[in-house]
Structures are given as structure tokens and as C-alpha cells.
Amino acid sequence: MILPILKGLALTLNRFFSKPITIQYPEEKVPPAKRWRGIQYFEKDERGKTKCVACGLCMAVCPSQCIYIETAEDEEGRRYPLTYELDATRCIFCGFCEEACPVGAIFMGKNYEWVEPERKPYIMTTEKLLEEKKNNP
């Protein structure tokens, strides 16, 4: 009866002096894995506007159908997204939208800290997707 107690005590003492596995999350942060897919963001072109040409491929390839696009043309005849909405509550973060984009406008970010008390902030518009670039160096 005393032998199992001594074995358990020896194991406890052995682990007591080893490096802790736990991190103190809010103060310490683990960098995401190389292939981590967080919330999406848009890249800007040389004019400072979104690179998106509103081709609709991301909307067509999305398995959860969380992307909605309305297109328009500017005075130079270039297409742009008049309305681009990404519903992050429906998104499964598969990365198909990033792969399908022919101009490299949308990217999967590294941001994994995104908590809001209401659902409305999870509807990402063009402006919010351009802003999200700041959270993804």
C-alpha cells in the first residue's frame, strides 16, 4: 500500500521541477501556426482602393455561402464591389475564397482573437475587410 503512494509522490516531484506546459493566456500569446486561417482581410491596390474586381468567384466557390457581392463599374470601366459582405458567423474558414481569387485581393488572416457581444460586427463589409489588414502583419 505504501509503494503506490511513493511512486505517485516520485512522479509528482519529477514533474514539479520540469518546465510548465500551461501559458497565461491574456498576458502571454502563442503565435498561430504557419497555415492558420483566421478572419479574412482585403489588400489595397496602388490607388488605395480594394484590389477586388468583383468577379464573384469567391462567392461561387464558398461552401457555406457566406459571401454576397453586388458589382458596379467606375468611370474608367473597372468593376468593383458596390456591396461586399462576408458573414463571419457562417464562414467555415476553409480558404477557398483566397484560392479562387484571380487578383489576390482576399487573404486569410492570422487574427484569432475576435469576440463581440452582438452578431452585427461579424458581418464584414469592404471597409472592415480593408481595416482588418492592420491586425495581420
What are these regions (language model features)?
Residues M1-E85, T89-R90, E99, V103-P137:
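Non-ligating segments of multi-cofactor redox enzymes
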Residues C94:
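Basic, alpha-helical nucleic-acid-binding regions used in initiation and control of genome expression
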